[in-house]
Amino acid sequence: MIGETVSDSPTSGLFKSILKHEVQKALGCTEPGAVAFAAAIAAQVLKDGGKFSPDNIEKVWVTVCPGVMKNGAAVTLPGTEGQGIGLPLAAALGVLAANPDGLNTLQGVDAKAREQAACLVCQNHVGLSSTEGSEFFIEVKLEMKNGVTSEVQITGGHTHVASVKKNEKDVPWNSISENGNGTSTDVPLSDLSYRERLRKCSFEDLIAMAGELSIKDARYVKLGVDMNLRLAKVGLEMGRPAVASLQKMVIHNVSAPSLETNIKLMVAAATSARMGGADVPAMSSGGSGNQGVDTTLPPYLFGKDKNIPEDRILKSIALAHIINAYCKAFFGDLAPACGCAVSAGLGATAAIAYQINPTLEAVTCAIQNLTAMIAGMLCDGASEGCAAKVVVAADAILWAGCAAGYGDNLSGGAAGIVGKTAEETIKNLNRVIQGMLPLDPEINDVIRMNAGNVHRACFKRPPLSAMAQLSTFEV
C-alpha cells in the first residue's frame, strides 16, 4: 500500500528532490522554454515601475550549449499558432513576457507579443551563439538603448538559475521569486546535490525508494499521468504524421488494435502535439516533456490493461522517474543519445517489469534488455521526428519490460555494453555516451546546412508587419 515515506530510509527525501527538480509541468519543448525563462528573468530585472517597453531594447544576446542549440533549432514553439520556431524567437517572446514562470513562461503569449517578437528577430535585435562545452548552459544578456543591462545564466538543468545580474552586479534571484514574479521550480545551483546522492545509490535503493511512495507524492505522479493523457488526446485530434501513419496501419491491416498499438498511438499523439506547438502542457521527467510522456504513458496504459493495482502502477511510474533521474546524474541533462531510449526508456521498461514482478532481478533484466535493443538511438534535435523515435522506444520498452517480467533475458546477460548488473550497465552506457559528446557540434552543422541556417528562423509564415521588415533588415 502507498503510505508515508519511512523517515530513517537512506534515500529519505531524495524522491521529493527528484520531483521538485526534474518532474515539472512544461509547455512545449523544454530547451526553448528554458531560454524563454532566462530571457523573462532578464526582462523582469529591468522592469521599471512594472513597465517594460520592447521599443527600448537594443540587443538580446543568447548563448547556449550545443545540446540546447540542437533541440531548439526546428521545434515549433507554443503560443505561436503552430508557426513559430527557433531559439531567437523563444528569447524574444520571453523578454516580451517579462513574467518568468519556469518551463511555462510561454503560456498566454498573445498575437501582439508574437508580432513584436517577430520584429525583434527580423530586425536582428536577437543574437545567438553556442558554447563549446557539453554541460547544460543558457545565458541571456539584455541590453537596453539607455545602456542598462541584465544577464541571466541557467546551468545544470532547465530551471536551475545560477546567476542573475543587473549592470554587471549580482541580483538575488530569490528576491524576484518571492515577489511573485518567479516560479516554484527555480532553484539555486547548490541544490543539485541530490544528484550526488543519486549516483551513490544502488538499484536496490532506487526500487526501495519507489516502494516508499507517500500518498502526497503518489497524487503528484498521478497528476502527471493525467496531464500527459490529456496531451495525447489533443494530439489525436491534431492528427499529425506519426499519429496518422499508425492509424492507417490499422485501417490497412498492417497492424491490429492491441495494447501495443494503443501505447504507440498515445505516445505518438502526446509527443507530436508537443513538437507541433500545442498550447497544452506535459508533465516532464528529467527536464524533458517527451521523456515525461515516455516514463508515464507506457507503464500506465500497460498496468490498466492488465488490471495491475493502482498503487503498484503509481509506484512503478515513480520508479521510472527515479531511474530517469539516476541516468541523468551520469549522462548529463542533454546527451547525444535519445533520452527517450537511454534514460526515460530505461525507467519505463523497468516500470513495466516491476508491475509484473517487483523484484531487483526483473528490473535489472529490463535494463539489460532495453540497453541491448536501442541504446544507440541518436538525438538529432527536437522536431516532428521525435514522435517517431518515441514510438520506436515505446515498442522496445514494452517488449523489454514484459520479457524481463516474465523471466526472459534478451541480451543473454553481460554482452556488448550490457553489464552484469543494472548499475554496471548504466556505467558502461555512460562511457559510450561520453564518447559521443563531439557529435553535437557536428549535428548542429548538419542541421544548419540542411535547413538553410534554421537557427536564425523565426516564423514559418511571419506576421505581415514582420515581413515588411525583411526588405530593410538582413535575416
Stretch-by-stretch model annotation:
Residues 23-41, 277-297, 339-343:
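Conserved phosphate/anionic-ligand binding catalytic regions in large, soluble enzymes, centered on
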Residues 2-17, 54-68, 257-277, 310-328, ...:
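Acidic-glycine-rich active-site phosphate/pyrophosphate-binding loop
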Residues 253-261, 265, 274-308:
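Membrane-embedded translocation segments of transport machinery
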Residues 56-104, 116-126, 312-360, 366, ...:
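A structural-propensity feature for long, helix-poor, extended segments
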Residues 49-59, 102-107, 128-130, 216-222, ...:
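Flexible, glycine/charged-enriched surface loops at secondary-structure junctions
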Residues 3, 7, 12, 26-30, ...:
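A structural signal for small-residue-enriched, beta-sheet-centric alpha/beta enzyme cores
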Residues 122-277, 443-464, 474:
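Signature of multi-pass transmembrane helix bundles
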Residues 32-50, 292-309, 349-357:
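Alpha-helical support elements that line or immediately flank enzyme active sites
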